[in-house]
């Protein structure tokens, strides 16, 4: 069995996922043979090896006979798949589950495909405030999207991939145009699927369109159980790129990496040291509300940390020292924010070297629900810390002490270690 890492620096969609698997070596003819077990007809699959920004990858597409370009429609499930064609047939969740159950696909593929559709259906039901049974899959229920989702599950089985990890996902910002007006990014179904999941998502303010489709988010939420950078003990064996079809103004691809893990003692551990920028300013006439606002603005802009220290200035004035830690490349951005949002007329800079533990996330199942756990490593040192937000949410939901959920998460992590 193999481990797959998804580097979603430009988001994720169904066709990008399949394109990446094909670029990694998934047999196209085998994929078509397995998809025929759905017992549906009237579609054609295409793959094309091409280059974006001089980097070669694979584009995957589904075309439905007699269909037309759907462009941007109500639920907007396929921003990345803007070239797909279908007949706009609407299906309910029960119709899709019956189609999958009636196929000759393996039980594993059926289970995963139905779970993905369930995630999307639950999100749509919440967004549109309707019973789950009444949700219409105006797009994901269409044939091309069924092929996307089932095809991804088939591809993972054919390639014997049993473990999937992912980077933090990237999404765009602003608004997109749909049949009934404008929709914010992340789109509502994607945002709804984030509820209770702790899937890390960063918004790119330089991209004014959708990067994560509900199909892509459904795939990630159902199949990915660990988030973070590529493990430091990973030895990549193959890299593939699946291209999206949206013009994002940049390199629009999902990078997929097949890798093997080696023991940390077998390799030199790198990337434990880097430089961090520290910016300081003394403020003796800034309101408390203003301080809170600038902290939020700086953190939103990418600062690593922001904190305040009470100080005594000349003429015995009580004041506040603002300290901002951030990336050295963000010096101008953070400086402009400080000068714009505070009363200071100058700032101080220092660059510090630091040693950091490598971090990644995994999800563990507790009796109360899933909890994200941060795993930090440095040489032979390892620390595991359940995420506060997950534990707090479950403690409130079940009216139990926070510590009870926290300890349950630690027990679940220990069980994973024993199984490994």
From Swiss-Prot:
**Which molecular-function annotations from GO does this UniProt entry contain?**
lyase activity; nickel cation binding
User: For this chain's UniProt record, which GO biological process terms are given?
Assistant: protein maturation; viral translational frameshifting
Q: Does the keyword Nucleotide-binding apply?
A: no
Q: What induces it?
A: Induced by L-lactate and repressed by D-lactate. Is thus regulated by the L-lactate/D-lactate ratio. Makes part of the lar operon (larABCDE).
Keywords attached to this Swiss-Prot or TrEMBL record, sorted alphabetically, are: Lyase, Nickel
Q: EC number(s) for this protein?
A: 4.99.1.12
Lineage: superkingdom? Bacteria
The family database entries (Pfam families) matched by this protein are listed as:
Ni_insertion
Family of this protein: Belongs to the LarC family.
What the protein does?
Involved in the biosynthesis of a nickel-pincer cofactor ((SCS)Ni(II) pincer complex). Binds Ni(2+), and functions in nickel delivery to pyridinium-3,5-bisthiocarboxylic acid mononucleotide (P2TMN), to form the mature cofactor. Is required for the activation of the lactate racemase LarA. May also be involved in the activation of other nickel-pincer cofactor-dependent enzymes.
- Protein name according to UniProt: Pyridinium-3,5-bisthiocarboxylic acid mononucleotide nickel insertion protein
């Amino acid at each position: 069995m193999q481990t797959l890492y998804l580097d979603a620096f430009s988001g994720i969609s169904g066709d990008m996922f399949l394109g990446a698997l094909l670029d990694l070596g998934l047999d196209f003819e085998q994929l078509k043979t397995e998809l025929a077990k759905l017992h549906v007809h009237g579609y054609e699959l295409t793959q094309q090896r091409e280059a974006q920004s001089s980097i070669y990858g694979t584009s995957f597409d589904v075309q439905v006979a007699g269909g037309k370009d759907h462009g941007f429609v109500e639920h907007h499930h396929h921003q990345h798949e803007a070239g797909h064609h279908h007949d706009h047939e609407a299906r309910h969740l029960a119709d899709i589950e019956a189609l999958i159950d009636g196929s000759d696909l393996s039980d594993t593929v059926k289970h995963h495909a139905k779970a993905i559709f369930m995630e999307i259906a639950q999100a749509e039901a919440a967004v549109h405030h309707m019973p789950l049974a009444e949700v219409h899959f105006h797009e994901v229920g269409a044939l091309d999207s069924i092929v996307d989702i089932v095809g991804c599950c088939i591809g993972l089985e054919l390639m014997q991939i049993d473990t999937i990890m992912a980077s933090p996902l990237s999404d765009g910002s602003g608004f997109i145009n749909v049949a009934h007006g404008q929709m914010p990014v992340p789109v509502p179904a994607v945002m709804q699927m984030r509820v209770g999941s702790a899937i890390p998502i960063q918004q790119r303010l330089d991209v004014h369109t959708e990067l994560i489709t509900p199909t892509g988010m459904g795939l990630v939420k159902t199949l990915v159980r660990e988030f973070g950078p590529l493990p430091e003990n990973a030895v990549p064996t193959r890299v593939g790129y699946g291209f999206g079809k949206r013009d994002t103004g940049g390199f629009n691809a999902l990078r997929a990496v097949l890798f093997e893990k080696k023991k940390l003692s077998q390799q030199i551990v790198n990337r434990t040291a880097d430089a961090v920028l520290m910016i300081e300013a003394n403020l003796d006439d800034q309101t408390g509300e203003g301080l809170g606002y600038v902290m939020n603005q700086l953190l939103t802009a990418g600062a690593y940390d922001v904190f305040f220290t009470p100080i005594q200035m000349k003429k015995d004035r009580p004041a506040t020292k603002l300290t901002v830690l951030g990336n050295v490349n963000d010096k101008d951005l953070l400086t402009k924010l400080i000068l714009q949002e505070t009363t200071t007329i100058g700032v101080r800079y220092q660059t510090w070297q630091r040693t950091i533990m490598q971090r990644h996330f995994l999800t563990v199942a507790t009796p109360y629900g899933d909890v994200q756990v941060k795993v930090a490593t440095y040489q032979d040192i390892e620390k595991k810390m359940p995420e506060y937000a997950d534990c707090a949410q479950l403690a409130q939901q079940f009216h139990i002490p926070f510590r009870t959920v926290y300890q349950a998460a630690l027990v679940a992590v220990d069980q994973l270690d024993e199984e490994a």
